[in-house]
C-alpha cells in the first residue's frame, strides 16, 4: 500500500504516534488497512457546499464499513454567483489551480491509498479532477448535488439565471419591484448547486460519462436521501478501486475526453466545460487535443436535452426524465457517437452502467430520432478575430439566429460594457466587444454574466451580440461568444477591433470574423500598446505571469527554460 510509506517500519514510529493522536486509528489493526483521503469542500458561503460536512460523515462511515480508514481534509471554494460583477470574479478561475495544488499537496504529502472527492460548484469539481489525474491515486467523485428549482408567486419555475435576467428587466422598467423581490427571495430554495445546466451541474454530469462518478451523480438532488445513498455506494466502489489499483489515468483517456464533449453537446452544457475539459486533457498528458476536434464531435452528436437557462426545465426535471444515464443510453444506441466500452469507477463499462436506462419524459429528454438539433449544443468558432478558437452555446441562441452581422462597440473591461448597456449606449445591431478580460488580462477570465443578462433582460437577446476573451456563466444565453483565443493581453486580434467595424458571427459555418483586411489589422498592431498586468502583487500577479489563453484550458505553464 502507498500508505506503508508513513506507517510501516521502525523509522515511522513518530508518524504512527501522530496518527494515533488524530483519533482515526481505533485499533492496532487499523494500521494495516488502506488510508483513504476524503477531499471535501465544505464552506458556509457557498450554498452548493453548506451540506458537504454531513455528506463527508456519510462517506467516512461507509469507508470504515468497507475496510478503509478515512481522513478528511478541505479545499477552498468560490461562489461564482456571489463573486460576480466585481473583483471577486477575478479569483474564480484561478481558484481551480489553488484547489488542484492544495489537494495534490495533502494527498502526496501523506501517501494516501485512495481519495474520495466531494465537490459541487463551478471550479471545485474541475480543480479536484485535475488533482486526481495529477496524483493518479485510485479515486472516485460524488458531488453534493443540485438544488431544487424555485417557484415564483405566479407559478413560474425559477433558477439563479432568472434573477440575473430580472436585474436587466427591473432596471429597464419592464418588471415591477414586487416581482423582482419575489424572484430574489424564491429562486434558490435549498442547498445544492444552482438548479439549471450551469457550469457546476454540467461538470457533475460529465463526471458520469468520464467514468469517475456513479450514475446519478449529476442530477440527484442535494436534499434527497438518494444523494446520501450515492455517497455510500461510491465509498464501496472506491475501496474496490484501491484493491484492484485502478487509477484515474486508467479511466480518463482520450476516448473519455471525446465522450465528455459528446455528452456536453447532447445536453447543451456550459461553455466553461470546454475550458475545464481541455485543462483535464492537458493534465492527463493527452496530447494534440484542440478545439477543432470538439467541432468534429458536435457534428455527430445530436442535441437531446435543453435545460435552463435554455428552457424552463431544471436538473430535477432531467433526473425524473431518466437522468444523465438516459441521455447516454441514446448516445450508446446511436452508434459511433461515443466509446461505450470504456471502464468506469463502478467496475462496469459505460454501456453496462446505462443498460437499463430509459427516457421517462420525452419533453425533457428527446429521443435520438427527434432531437432539438441534429448537431450538438456547443460550437467552436474560428476566424480572424479568433484564430485559436472561441466558444458559443448555440443551444442558448434563438433558433431564428443563424448569422448575425453587426457593428462593433468596444470595451476594455466588463464594468465599462455593463454601464453602456444599462444607459442604452448599446443598441440593436451592435456587437459588444469586451477584451482584456481573458485569463491573463482579467486577470482570471471573469464571467460576463451581468452584461449578457442585461442584454437579454432588455429584450435584445436576438438583436445584440457579445464577444469576449473572457468567459460566461453557465447561466448565460443569447448570442454570446466567449473564450476568444489568443486573448487581447497575449496579443490576440480581438485587441485590434475598432468601434464601427463590421463583425459576422456565422453559426452554421462556425466562423467569427471582422470585415477588415489583414493589412489593416497589421497596421493596427503596430499601434497596439504593450499589455501591462493589472495586478502587481499576491496570487493573481503570479497567476498572470504563468497562465495561458483559453484554447489550452487556461492552464498555468512553467517557463520552458526552467524544465528543459
Swiss-Prot record:
First and last residue of the signal peptide: none
Pathway: Amino-acid biosynthesis; L-isoleucine biosynthesis; L-isoleucine from 2-oxobutanoate: step 3/4; Amino-acid biosynthesis; L-valine biosynthesis; L-valine from pyruvate: step 3/4
Co-factor requirement: [2Fe-2S] cluster; Mg(2+)
Catalytic activity: (2R)-2,3-dihydroxy-3-methylbutanoate = 3-methyl-2-oxobutanoate + H2O; (2R,3R)-2,3-dihydroxy-3-methylpentanoate = (S)-3-methyl-2-oxopentanoate + H2O
GO cellular component: cytosol
Positions contributing to [2Fe-2S] cluster binding: 121, 194
Pfam families per UniProt: ILV_EDD_C (PF24877), ILVD_EDD_N (PF00920)
Active site: 473 (proton acceptor)
Keywords: 2Fe-2S, Amino-acid biosynthesis, Branched-chain amino acid biosynthesis, Iron, Iron-sulfur, Lyase, Magnesium, Metal-binding
Cofactor note text: Binds 1 [2Fe-2S] cluster per subunit. This cluster acts as a Lewis acid cofactor.
Binding-site residues for Mg(2+), renumbered to this chain: 80, 122-123, 447
Chain positions with N6-carboxylysine modification: 123
Family as reported in the entry's similarity comment: Belongs to the IlvD/Edd family.
HAMAP family recorded: IlvD
NCBIfam families registered for this protein in UniProt: ilvD (TIGR00110), PRK00911.1 (NF002068)
Known function: Functions in the biosynthesis of branched-chain amino acids. Catalyzes the dehydration of (2R,3R)-2,3-dihydroxy-3-methylpentanoate (2,3-dihydroxy-3-methylvalerate) into 2-oxo-3-methylpentanoate (2-oxo-3-methylvalerate) and of (2R)-2,3-dihydroxy-3-methylbutanoate (2,3-dihydroxyisovalerate) into 2-oxo-3-methylbutanoate (2-oxoisovalerate), the penultimate precursor to L-isoleucine and L-valine, respectively.
Protein name stated in the entry: Dihydroxy-acid dehydratase
Amino acid at each position: 500500500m502507498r500508505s506503508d510509506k508513513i506507517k510501516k517500519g521502525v523509522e515511522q514510529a513518530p508518524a504512527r504516534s501522530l496518527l494515533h493522536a488524530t483519533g482515526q486509528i481505533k485499533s492496532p489493526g487499523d494500521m494495516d488497512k488502506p488510508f483513504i483521503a476524503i477531499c471535501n469542500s465544505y464552506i458556509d458561503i457557498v450554498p452548493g457546499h453548506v451540506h458537504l460536512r454531513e455528506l463527508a460523515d456519510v462517506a467516512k462511515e461507509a469507508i470504515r464499513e468497507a475496510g478503509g480508514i478515512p481522513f478528511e481534509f478541505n479545499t477552498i471554494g468560490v461562489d461564482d454567483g456571489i463573486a460576480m460583477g466585481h473583483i471577486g470574479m477575478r479569483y474564480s478561475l484561478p481558484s481551480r489551480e489553488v484547489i488542484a495544488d492544495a489537494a495534490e499537496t495533502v494527498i502526496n504529502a501523506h501517501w494516501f491509498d485512495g481519495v474520495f472527492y466531494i465537490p459541487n460548484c463551478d471550479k471545485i469539481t474541475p480543480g479536484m479532477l485535475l488533482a486526481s489525474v495529477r496524483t493518479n491515486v485510485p479515486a472516485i467523485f460524488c458531488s453534493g448535488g443540485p438544488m431544487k428549482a424555485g417557484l415564483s408567486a405566479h407559478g413560474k419555475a425559477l433558477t439563479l439565471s432568472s434573477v440575473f435576467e430580472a436585474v436587466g428587466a427591473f432596471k429597464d422598467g419592464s418588471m415591477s419591484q414586487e416581482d423582482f423581490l419575489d424572484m430574489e427571495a424564491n429562486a434558490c430554495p435549498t442547498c445544492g448547486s444552482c438548479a439549471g445546466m450551469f457550469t457546476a451541474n454540467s461538470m457533475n454530469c460529465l463526471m458520469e460519462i468520464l467514468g469517475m462518478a456513479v450514475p446519478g451523480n449529476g442530477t440527484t438532488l442535494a436534499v434527497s436521501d438518494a444523494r446520501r445513498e450515492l455517497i455510500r455506494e461510491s465509498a464501496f466502489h472506491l475501496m474496490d478501486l484501491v484493491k484492484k489499483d485502478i487509477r484515474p489515468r486508467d479511466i480518463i483517456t482520450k476516448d473519455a475526453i471525446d465522450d465528455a464533449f459528446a455528452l456536453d453537446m447532447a445536453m447543451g452544457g456550459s461553455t466553461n466545460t470546454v475550458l475545464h475539459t481541455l485543462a483535464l486533457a492537458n493534465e492527463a498528458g493527452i496530447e494534440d487535443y484542440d478545439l477543432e476536434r470538439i467541432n468534429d464531435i458536435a457534428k455527430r452528436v445530436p442535441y437531446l436535452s435543453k435545460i435552463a437557462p435554455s428552457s424552463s426545465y431544471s436538473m430535477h426535471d432531467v433526473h425524473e426524465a431518466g437522468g444523465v444515464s438516459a441521455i447516454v443510453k441514446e448516445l450508446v444506441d446511436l452508434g459511433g457517437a461515443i466509446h461505450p466500452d470504456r471502464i468506469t469507477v463502478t467496475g462496469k463499462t459505460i454501456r453496462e452502467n446505462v443498460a437499463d436506462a430509459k427516457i421517462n419524459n420525452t419533453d425533457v429528454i428527446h429521443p435520438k430520432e427527434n432531437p432539438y438539433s441534429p448537431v450538438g449544443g456547443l460550437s467552436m468558432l474560428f476566424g480572424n478575430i479568433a484564430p485559436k478558437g472561441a466558444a458559443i452555446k448555440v443551444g442558448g441562441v434563438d433558433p431564428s439566429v443563424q448569422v448575425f452581422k453587426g457593428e462593433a462597440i468596444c470595451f476594455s473591461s466588463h464594468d465599462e460594457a455593463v454601464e453602456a448597456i444599462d444607459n442604452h449606449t448599446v443598441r440593436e445591431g451592435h456587437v459588444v466587444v469586451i477584451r482584456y478580460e481573458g485569463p491573463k488580462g482579467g486577470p482570471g477570465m471573469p464571467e460576463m454574466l451581468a452584461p449578457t443578462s442585461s442584454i437579454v433582460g432588455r429584450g435584445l437577446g436576438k438583436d445584440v451580440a457579445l464577444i469576449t476573451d473572457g468567459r460566461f456563466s453557465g447561466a448565460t444565453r443569447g448570442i454570446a461568444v466567449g473564450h476568444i483565443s489568443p486573448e487581447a493581453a497575449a496579443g490576440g486580434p480581438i485587441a485590434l477591433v475598432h468601434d464601427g467595424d463590421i463583425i459576422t458571427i456565422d453559426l452554421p459555418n462556425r466562423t467569427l470574423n471582422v470585415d477588415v483586411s489583414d493589412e489593416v489589422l497589421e497596421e493596427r498592431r503596430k499601434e497596439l500598446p504593450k499589455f501591462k498586468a493589472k495586478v502587481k502583487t499576491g496570487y493573481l500577479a503570479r497567476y498572470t505571469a504563468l497562465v495561458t489563453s483559453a484554447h489550452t484550458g487556461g492552464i498555468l505553464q512553467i517557463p520552458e527554460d526552467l524544465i528543459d
